[in-house]
């Protein structure tokens, strides 16, 4: 399945719009990961712990989006938008939401 942030696909013609598709993935970040991330915050640098969680959540959300588009009979999703949110009282959860338009291209 073709998945793109652009509203069209070069060299392909959209022949049918199947509708808007979306998916959300929420992941919790546990105490051990928070501790490791806090050490990174103190000394500076990138937090591989949180980055890996974001990557995993984004990949899961994109896969779920493709599954939902396929259920509608689409073979592509255009206009993908990916949003990230921090949730929970202590910011202990991360949400990735993905939306796009399911289409049939040829």
From Swiss-Prot:
HAMAP family: UPF0145 (MF_00338)
Source organism, top-level taxon: Bacteria
Protein's recorded name: UPF0145 protein Athe_0545
Disulfide-bonded cysteines: none
The organism's taxonomic lineage, starting at the top: Bacteria, Bacillati, Bacillota, Bacillota incertae sedis, Caldicellulosiruptorales
UniProt xrefs under Pfam families: YbjQ_1
Natural source organism: Caldicellulosiruptor bescii (strain ATCC BAA-1888 / DSM 6725 / KCTC 15123 / Z-1320)
Signal sequence extent: none
Family: Belongs to the UPF0145 family.
Gene3D superfamilies referenced in this protein's UniProt entry, alphabetically: Hypothetical protein apc22750. Chain B
């Amino acid at each position: 399945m073709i998945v793109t942030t652009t509203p069209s696909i070069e060299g392909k013609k959209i022949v049918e719009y199947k509708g808007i598709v979306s998916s959300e993935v929420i992941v919790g970040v546990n105490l051990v990961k928070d501790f490791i991330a806090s050490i990174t915050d103190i000394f500076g640098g990138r937090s591989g712990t949180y980055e890996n969680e974001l990557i995993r959540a984004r990949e899961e959300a994109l896969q779920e989006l493709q599954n939902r588009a396929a259920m509608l009979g689409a073979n592509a999703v255009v206009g993908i938008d990916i949003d990230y949110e921090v949730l929970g009282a202590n910011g202990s959860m991360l949400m990735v939401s993905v939306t796009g338009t399911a289409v049939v291209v040829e």
